[in-house]
């Protein structure tokens, strides 16, 4: 599903929230991100500031959390001290391989991971919403610098 302002508005209204200009602007930023790019709250704040969109950092944090709870964004732990976010596109499942030294992140697809997630959630009586695997390791470049 591709999220639009209309679908976001409908989802928010269903849950008793409204589509504010700030929420719509944040959604637009994520829709326009290049594939494979993830933003932290601070990254998003700086991006919006550079576009003269004065949205406070606290509003950004609240909006990111809300959109993640609603399933519009995926919250990612990319081996840094803060979360990153990306647009959740259910038909584009992918996983992350992260270097713990330099934070380089590679996205990859694996039908096996998705099948295991689906099978496990079904076995336990869960309805699968998302399935993601994050692998932490040391990239080849950082391995060479450790020698």
UniProtKB/Swiss-Prot annotation:
Residues covered by region (Dimerization): 91-147
GO cellular component terms, A-Z: cytoplasm
Positions annotated to bind Zn(2+): 38, 86, 96, 99, 102, 107
Chain residue ranges for the region called DNA-binding: 1-90
Pfam families the record matches: FUR
GO molecular function: DNA-binding transcription factor activity; transcription cis-regulatory region binding; zinc ion binding
Residues annotated to bind Fe cation: 93, 95
Keyword annotations of the record: Cytoplasm, DNA-binding, Iron, Metal-binding, Repressor, Transcription, Transcription regulation, Zinc
Keyword Ribonucleoprotein recorded: no
InterPro entries, sorted: FUR, Fur_C, WH-like_DNA-bd_sf, WH_DNA-bd_sf
Any one of the GO BP annotations: negative regulation of DNA-templated transcription
Subcellular location: Cytoplasm
Function text: Acts as a global negative controlling element, employing Fe(2+) as a cofactor to bind the operator of the repressed genes. Regulates genes involved in iron scavenging or photosynthetic electron transport.
Subunit structure: Homodimer.
Similarity comment text for this entry: Belongs to the Fur family.
Protein name as annotated: Ferric uptake regulation protein
Native source organism of the sequence: Synechococcus elongatus (strain ATCC 33912 / PCC 7942 / FACHB-805)
